[in-house]
Amino acid sequence: MKIGIIGAMEEEVTLLRDKIDNRQTITLGGCEIYTGQLNGTEVALLKSGIGKVAAALGATLLLGHCKPDVIINTGSAGGLASTLKVGDIVVSDEARYHDADVTAFGYEYGQLPGCPAGFKADDKLIAAAESCIRELNLNAVRGLIVSGDAFINGSVGLAKIRHNFPDAVAVEMEATAIAHVCHNFNVPFVVVRAISDVADQQSHLSFDEFLAVAAKQSTLMVETLVQKLAHG
């Protein structure tokens, strides 16, 4: 099995990259892909860049060039669920765009023409992630993750997301674009991210402060998940 892993930022991939043996670097379209073995398992780790376009471009390049069997999207996220705090884990059962609106033509809010309203994560990957969470004794929430090209740092943006997606557990800027690409290529995916901030008017301050905490927690989760997927 070859496992594809996608993170947006240097801070979100550096700990995993440093653990890859026999590492080779491929630079394509402004993205970097690091291939090799993570604890004996073949992996391809993509640093995509921030935002939906960068994530979709990177995911497409990763799938075409490295042909992974599954995709794990990792990194940081803003917490929406009331039980989440910095360092906790969110696992997707679905991903949706929070900044797409074609409702004038009868689509659901967040749905693009020709696409489902939401992109469902793979049940087996979700189950494996939840098993890792139990083994590591981490606090985690499973649910809807929403994505858009905005860092949510104010009451207006937050209220809009809560109104349109009351069940959303976390918000970030890449996961749904990656899920969209995986859907088109029929490749199983799951989003496993750590909370770096709680989406509110001070989220930019806590993001800067706690990104390293989120990166450490998400790396631990992904490393454990890769082992479980490879060896059961």
Curated annotation (Swiss-Prot):
Superkingdom to which the source organism belongs: Bacteria
InterPro entries: MTA_SAH_Nsdase (IPR010049), Nucleoside_phosphorylase_d (IPR000845), Nucleoside_phosphorylase_sf (IPR035994)
Pathway: Amino-acid biosynthesis; L-methionine biosynthesis via salvage pathway; S-methyl-5-thio-alpha-D-ribose 1-phosphate from S-methyl-5'-thioadenosine (hydrolase route): step 1/2
EC number: 3.2.2.9
GO CC annotations, alphabetized: cytosol
Catalytic residue positions: E12, D197
A single BP term in Gene Ontology: purine deoxyribonucleoside catabolic process
Keywords of this entry: Amino-acid biosynthesis, Hydrolase, Methionine biosynthesis
Catalytic activities: S-adenosyl-L-homocysteine + H2O = S-(5-deoxy-D-ribos-5-yl)-L-homocysteine + adenine; S-methyl-5'-thioadenosine + H2O = 5-(methylsulfanyl)-D-ribose + adenine; 5'-deoxyadenosine + H2O = 5-deoxy-D-ribose + adenine
Family of the protein in this entry: Belongs to the PNP/UDP phosphorylase family. MtnN subfamily.
Role played: Catalyzes the irreversible cleavage of the glycosidic bond in both 5'-methylthioadenosine (MTA) and S-adenosylhomocysteine (SAH/AdoHcy) to adenine and the corresponding thioribose, 5'-methylthioribose and S-ribosylhomocysteine, respectively. Also cleaves 5'-deoxyadenosine, a toxic by-product of radical S-adenosylmethionine (SAM) enzymes, into 5-deoxyribose and adenine. Thus, is required for in vivo function of the radical SAM enzymes biotin synthase and lipoic acid synthase, that are inhibited by 5'-deoxyadenosine accumulation.
Subunit structure, interactors included: Homodimer.
Protein's UniProt name: 5'-methylthioadenosine/S-adenosylhomocysteine nucleosidase
Originating organism: Salmonella paratyphi A (strain ATCC 9150 / SARB42)
Lineage: Bacteria, Pseudomonadati, Pseudomonadota, Gammaproteobacteria, Enterobacterales
